[in-house]
């Protein structure tokens, strides 16, 4: 049974304001048993022999485990993060078994002997080195680190390892960090608000804000400077929308259940672009 409809109800509402790992864990709780059964049978997730479903299950298991490692980097997972994680799981009506499975994967990443580099190299292998999927994985980890509003130096160190093993330079990571931090502020400042519909899912509704700080965050979210010309602005927008195009990501291996997640990310990008267009008078 697909449970992403449950995830969507809170996923992006908490993406930049709460415990991101909990939201993803809801989906992983559904997928984890598949990965565990395959691991117990001695299956090795390599691009050549694994089915797409198997690779997808491994992708999510690893994503949640690495999030646990990121969260633990600063010494302990904060009380606020735990409370938000529990609240998210309760709101999504997870079964006790699903909660245990999600928590098990997260705890695995928190262990001091968690094989971070090996796990990341495996992710790079099972994705076939596809840039968009690896970028998506990196963005998940950044979102986990920024969930409580601040990135601890130890979390930043772990993120540098994640980026390195996935094939991203330190400069690329720092740019992504700036973009995600801007997205956090953009959401907190009113760029995004969510409301529940029918009790089953949450639809993001973007709201425009014309304050100087919101505009600055919109530029940073797109990864461009405030003095960028219209051509540069449009090119940055097209590039980001192409990288986060739901259909393209699914075609490259992202589970179909996560298509709506990619759609929400695209909405975030579009909201920033629309604000800049309005302020600049771009047609």
UniProtKB/Swiss-Prot annotation:
Q: Which GO terms describe its molecular function?
A: protein-folding chaperone binding
SMART domains recorded: DnaJ
Pfam families according to UniProt: DnaJ (PF00226), TerB (PF05099)
Q: Where in the cell is it found?
A: Cell inner membrane
Q: Where is this chain primarily localised?
A: membrane
Q: Where are the transmembrane segments?
A: 7-30
* Boundaries of every J domain copy: 217-283
Periplasmic face of the membrane: 1-6
Gene3D superfamilies hit by this protein? DnaJ domain, TerB-like
Q: Where is this region: Disordered?
A: 188-210
Topology within the bilayer: Single-pass type III membrane protein
**Which stretches are Cytoplasmic in the membrane topology?**
31-283
Q: Where is the composition biased (Low complexity)?
A: 198-210
Q: Where is the composition biased (Gly residues)?
A: 188-197
| GO CC annotation | plasma membrane
Keywords from UniProt, A to Z, are: Cell inner membrane, Cell membrane, Chaperone, Membrane, Transmembrane, Transmembrane helix
Q: According to its UniProt entry, what is the function of this protein?
A: Regulatory DnaK co-chaperone. Direct interaction between DnaK and DjlA is needed for the induction of the wcaABCDE operon, involved in the synthesis of a colanic acid polysaccharide capsule, possibly through activation of the RcsB/RcsC phosphotransfer signaling pathway. The colanic acid capsule may help the bacterium survive conditions outside the host.
Quote the entry's note on domains: The transmembrane domain is a dimerization domain.
- PANTHER family, sorted: CO-CHAPERONE PROTEIN DJLA (PTHR24074)
Quaternary structure, from the entry: Homodimer.
Name the record gives this protein: Co-chaperone protein DjlA
Source taxonomy lineage? Bacteria, Pseudomonadati, Pseudomonadota, Gammaproteobacteria, Vibrionales
Encoding gene, per UniProt annotation: djlA
């Amino acid at each position: 049974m697909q449970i992403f409809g449950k995830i969507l109800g809170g996923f992006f509402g908490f993406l930049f304001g709460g415990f991101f790992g909990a939201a993803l864990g809801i989906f992983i709780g559904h997928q984890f048993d598949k990965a565990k059964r395959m691991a117990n049978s001695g299956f090795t997730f390599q691009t050549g022999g694994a089915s797409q479903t198997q690779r997808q299950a491994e992708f999510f298991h690893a994503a949640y485990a690495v999030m646990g490692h990121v969260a633990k980097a600063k010494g302990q997972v904060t009380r606020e993060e735990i409370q938000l994680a529990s609240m998210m799981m309760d709101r999504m009506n997870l079964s006790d078994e699903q909660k245990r499975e999600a928590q098990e994967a997260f705890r695995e990443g928190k262990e001091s002997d968690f094989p971070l580099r090996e796990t990341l190299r495996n992710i790079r292998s099972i994705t076939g080195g596809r840039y968009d999927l690896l970028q998506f994985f990196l963005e998940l980890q950044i979102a986990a680190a920024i969930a409580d509003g601040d990135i601890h130096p130890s979390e930043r160190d772990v993120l540098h390892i994640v980026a390195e093993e996935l094939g991203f330079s330190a400069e690329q990571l720092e740019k992504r960090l700036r973009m995600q931090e801007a997205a956090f502020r953009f959401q907190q400042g009113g760029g995004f608000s969510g409301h529940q519909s029918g009790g089953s899912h949450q639809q993001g509704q973007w709201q425009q804000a014309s304050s100087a700080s919101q505009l600055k965050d919109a530029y940073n979210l797109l990864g461009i400077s405030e003095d960028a010309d219209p051509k540069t602005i449009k090119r940055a927008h097209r590039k980001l929308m192409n990288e986060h195009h739901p259909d393209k990501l699914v075609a490259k291996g992202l589970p179909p259940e996560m298509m709506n997640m990619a759609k929400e990310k695209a909405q975030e990008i579009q909201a920033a672009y629309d604000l800049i267009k309005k302020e600049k008078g771009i047609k």
